[in-house]
């Protein structure tokens, strides 16, 4: 299936009340330039939406690339997360043919993923701004450790734990986002859609490694980096980079 360009999605979201089906009550939040507020990644663009009736904000994810089995996977993920009551995770809802987009594609109706909007900044951005603050980094190290312990006790796994996929909320607590590579118990025996991000993944991880333990190495690597940085911030200046912490794939 071919998907629209980000620019085509932007035009569709600008008139969301006309182009959305069941979610027509949502309106886009605009940035300082009057454009729909958004962030984009390799396979999708995410818009910040507002339900004016309740004042609640949502994240609306629109896909730009095909991913085999995505619809079925997200239905299973949604079912699993619907039973989870934790601030570390947000609920998701996959909706087929929800958004009409005038594009060059053969199709004109496309799926979306609806999630609660998590206010805050990525852990990557937070560390960049605060790594010289020993108190802030020590608290982050503690809170990450609590989240890691919770995640390892669950029957599911995130699949791509890294600082850019963790939001630090204004109250300082953490929430995992981006569930494209998530494992849930109903997927046992399936292949993983991803092997995670190289600088945070076990070097021997393959598509066949897909169970509730796939986050263990990433969690350990990040926890070790955070502890070291909290004790000696200059380590990040020496060994770090903009898209990772102290370790790269060449270190494993």
Where are these regions (language model features)?
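Conserved structural core of kinase catalytic domains
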Residues: 89-138
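Activation of the activation-loop gatekeeper triad in protein kinase-fold domains
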Residues: 178-183
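Conserved activation segment of eukaryotic-like protein kinases, specifically the C-terminal portion
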Residues: 190-204
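Juxta-kinase regulatory segment immediately upstream of eukaryotic protein kinase catalytic domains
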Residues: 1-37, 72-74
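Helical subdomain adjoining the active site within ATP-dependent kinase catalytic cores
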Residues: 228-252
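Catalytic-loop of the protein kinase fold
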Residues: 148, 152-164, 168-169
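ATP-binding glycine-rich loop module of kinase domains
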Residues: 34-36, 42-93
């Amino acid at each position: 299936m071919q998907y629209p360009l980000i620019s085509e999605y932007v035009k569709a979201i600008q008139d969301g009340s006309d182009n959305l089906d069941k979610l027509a009550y949502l309106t886009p939040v605009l940035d300082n330039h009057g454009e729909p507020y958004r962030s984009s990644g390799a396979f999708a663009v995410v818009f910040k939406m507002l339900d004016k009736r309740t004042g609640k904000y949502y994240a609306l994810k629109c896909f730009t690339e095909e991913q085999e089995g995505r619809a079925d996977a997200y239905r299973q993920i949604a079912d699993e997360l619907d039973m989870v009551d934790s601030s570390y995770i947000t609920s998701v809802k996959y909706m087929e043919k929800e958004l009409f987009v005038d594009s060059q594609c053969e199709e004109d109706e496309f799926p979306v993923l609806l999630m609660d909007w998590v206010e805050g900044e990525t852990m990557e951005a937070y560390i960049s701004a605060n790594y010289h603050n020993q108190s802030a980094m020590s608290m982050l190290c503690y809170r990450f450790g609590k989240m890691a312990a919770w995640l390892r006790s669950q029957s599911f796994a995130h699949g791509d734990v890294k600082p850019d996929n963790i939001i630090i909320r204004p109250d300082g607590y953490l929430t995992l986002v981006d569930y494209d590579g998530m494992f849930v118990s109903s997927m046992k025996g399936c292949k993983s859609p991803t092997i995670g991000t190289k600088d945070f993944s076990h070097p021997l991880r393959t598509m066949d490694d897909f169970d509730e333990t796939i986050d263990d190495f990433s969690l350990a690597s990040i926890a070790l980096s955070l502890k070291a940085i909290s004790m000696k911030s200059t380590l990040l200046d020496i060994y770090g980079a903009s898209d990772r912490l102290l370790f790269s794939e060449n270190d494993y």
